[in-house]
Curated annotation (Swiss-Prot):
One of its GO terms (molecular function) is nicotinate-nucleotide adenylyltransferase activity. CDD domains: NMNAT. It comes from Buchnera aphidicola subsp. Acyrthosiphon pisum (strain APS). Belongs to the NadD family. This is Probable nicotinate-nucleotide adenylyltransferase.
Length: 214
């Protein structure tokens, strides 16, 4: 059985234990051999923050140092460009064999508005979707719900047996840490050292990140 590679995209502003612990839990439960962290410089469905992409990347590198599970992709880091998942997956598939199983990790909150993503139905042509629990407001979209229902599987081993095309809902613990909360903590002078690796905390303090309201 082939082991999975997985892509975990996000703002990572900053990367924190919620990201890291979730990724390690998914890797253990579903036998993921490699998780590719995909920092977004300018995600289309979120407000842009003031943190530079170079600072985000540096914090990620510090957080995953000497952890062989992780690597970083720079495909969505070009300044002032808007990136779409479907385009990024096409580029990744040019580097990874179309026969190799690949997952794209997203939260249940993002799944609710998945129908707004560019060419959203085509994403399963390039990867599986691996969904992790996240608090969200239910948004009803009949077309999306039908699509999810028709492609969802309940045995994670099936993700290893074909390269793409399936949706799997993980039972990983819900993330109760948010990057926006951490940014606010720093802005108001509150301690966040328990929410992210100490080396990342030290970098934030050294560079005085998040000292202005974002």
């Amino acid at each position: 059985m082939k082991k999975l590679c997985a892509i975990f995209g996000g703002n990572f502003d900053p990367i924190h234990y919620g990201h890291i612990n979730l990724a390690e839990k998914l890797a253990k439960d579903i036998s993921i051999k490699k998780i590719i962290l995909l920092p977004n410089n300018y995600p289309p469905h979120r407000n842009k923050t003031q943190t530079s992409i170079s600072d985000k990347i540096k914090m990620i590198k510090l957080a995953i140092h000497n952890n062989p599970l992780f690597e970083i992709s720079y495909l969505e880091t070009k300044k002032n460009n808007i990136f779409y998942t479907i385009d990024t997956l096409k580029k990744i598939r040019k580097k990874i064999s179309h026969l190799e199983p690949l997952c794209f990790i997203i939260g249940e909150d993002n799944l609710q508005t998945f129908y707004l993503w560019k060419n959203w139905r085509e994403i399963l042509l390039y990867s599986h979707l691996l969904i992790y629990p996240r608090k969200h407001k239910k948004q009803k979209n009949d077309e999306l719900e039908k699509w999810i229902h028709s492609n969802t599987v309940y045995d994670c081993n099936l993700l290893h047996k074909q390269p793409c095309g399936l949706i799997f809902f993980s039972h990983a613990p819900c993330i109760n840490i948010s990057s926006s909360r951490i940014r606010k903590n720093y802005f108001y002078g509150k301690n966040s050292h328990s929410l992210l690796p100490s080396i990342v905390n030290n970098y934030i303090l050294l560079k005085k990140l998040y000292y202005t309201n974002q």
